[in-house]
Amino acid sequence: MVATTSSGGSSVGWPSRLSGVRLHLVTGKGGTGKSTIAAALALTLAAGGRKVLLVEVEGRQGIAQLFDVPPLPYQELKIATAERGGQVNALAIDIEAAFLEYLDMFYNLGIAGRAMRRIGAVEFATTIAPGLRDVLLTGKIKETVVRLDKNKLPVYDAIVVDAPPTGRIARFLDVTKAVSDLAKGGPVHAQSEGVVKLLHSNQTAIHLVTLLEALPVQETLEAIEELAQMELPIGSVIVNRNIPAHLEPQDLAKAAEGEVDADSVRAGLLTAGVKLPDADFAGLLTETIQHATRITARAEIAQQLDALQVPRLELPTVSDGVDLGSLYELSESLAQQGVR
């Protein structure tokens, strides 16, 4: 189940400029739920009859697990139907297959490329040239963005990428440096120029998933600063796993200082027909103080995000573990905040 929430900070919501974006890259510190949020975002963007591609680049088969489908092959398959007739397809990019596709596309090495795979040359090439891996991944992503159907219209209305975590996202997107380390010209260089242009355009937005905890927020702040220095477009910060405050602001402030009106609490319980033993009642008061302290600390951390002046979305806690149903609930929460 998904709980209602308030983080204590003011949520800016989804600005209209993001509604025209076609490439959404979702990153976040490990453990913040970035894969879950990427999946929910894809469902939201697909609502209303749109067609969205959800891309995985780290080989973990996380998309398959989230949508409860078999492991994904290296091809685009429908995995979900969105609200009002939309469709979400998924692609788990296999780096070796992408390399062979690249060799066949630019060098006509179809048969030779397959032979390279059999002798392990593909794995060898991507290992000794780490930048090549990111060039191939971003190149494939760009191809899905620009691909047209027989009517010369984009095949997909939007592409959502479950991108590498914040600690690696800048390097992953720094295609210019990766290519300069690999080639000064030729097909690799030419293709990468198109990737760079797309990543720095208003067609792209990078969304950072975080929790209202010190380490995730600090890593988010550092990643935003690094991405801004690279002049890459920041879309939003998505605060995941918020918890409800339950208390009015004035009561919350007092409880955080250890002040709880025990008589009022007991009277309220009795009015509701609840009578607790003294030990249980004392435990309830202790939990109230602990909860208020936690909410207050989260609100203080949220102030660091306020200072960014970056659009912020807030998502509630999924209490019983993430399943397909909770993905749709999170998607609805995003839609209520203007995501479209």
From Swiss-Prot:
It comes from the Bacteria. Keywords: ATP-binding, Hydrolase, Nucleotide-binding. Its EC number is 3.6.1.-. Pfam families: ArsA_ATPase. ATP binds at residues 31, 33-36, 240, 316, 318. GO terms for cellular component: plasma membrane. Belongs to the arsA ATPase family. BagA/BagB subfamily. Was identified as a high-confidence drug target. Component of the heterodimeric BagAB ATPase complex, whose two subunits are actively involved in ATP hydrolysis. The ATPase activity is required to mediate resistance against nitric oxide (NO) and elevated levels of glycerol. Binds nucleotides asymmetrically. The two ATPase domains of BagAB are spatially separated by the large central cavity and they do not physically interact with each other. This is ATPase BagA. The gene is bagA.
